Amino acid sequence: MSTDVELCGLVARLNQRLDSHIRRVADRLGITASQAIALRELGEPMRLTALAEHMSCETSNAGYVVDRMEDQGLVERLPDPGDRRAKLLSLTEAGLRCRGNVLQALSEQAPVEALSAEERDSLVALLRRATT
């Protein structure tokens, strides 16, 4: 088996394990996996289109997730100072607390916890290069 084929298989398996981990964390916190991903990505205010890109989904799907989060008091839409027509998504105090819980839970029993901190840093650097 070629290295490229093996790499594709390993990355796919890791992705499946990460998806399962996110679903377990979300279930434990009483939110959906999509909400957990959105909370992870909303470290700073951003437009819906940027969030959708970070979540690797269509803007309409991200909008549905944000609508639910807004109803739950986790996110609010604020005017974008750079464009009066646009809105920025910003976490509320409750959203910030929930994001902290998500980030903490994601770091516990993560599929990559067997790797040392240095190995995880190397993996992150390699994946960034491969995905940009």
Stretch-by-stretch model annotation:
Residues 48-49, 60, 67, 87:
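Residues within helix-turn-helix
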